[in-house]
Amino acid sequence: FNASQIRDIHRSLSSSQSGKRFFTTEWEVLRDREYLWIQKKGSSQLIPELIMEEVERTPSFVIPHDKHIACLDADLLNHPLTIRKWEKGDKFVPLGMNGKKKVSDYLTDKKFSLFQKENQYVVCSGEDIVWLVNERSDHRYRITDSTQRILLIQIKKDGQ
């Protein structure tokens, strides 16, 4: 960044305008609320690889309370499951809620930065979002007393 750009970035910190972006040939800076997010320009994440394990529901099964693991009723899912970045207008029913919520509203409520929003993935069964990856499962696919088969999904990490 040159001196003029640095002054502009500094000036943006004293204004109430969030979402301002600054670019060089290699870098991008985003002013989001009271933070500056810096990212290499054009850097794109690879589509995450899913690890899926189907298990029978037994009395000893304990539902993992971990947002990094989706725990879904396997009998309610339409295969194949797909993974993609969320799109404008996408909706899901966050676990524990009854009504649909726009993914964009959910991410805003959780105070995701613009960079984080741009890199958020969803797992879909048919047209339905069943998991906002590493955030929240869809309530309609939750484990209930009548669930017999459970599908556990997580994102493959390096070395897994």
Predicted regions and their residues:
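AMP-forming adenylation/ATP pyrophosphatase catalytic core
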Residues: 1-160
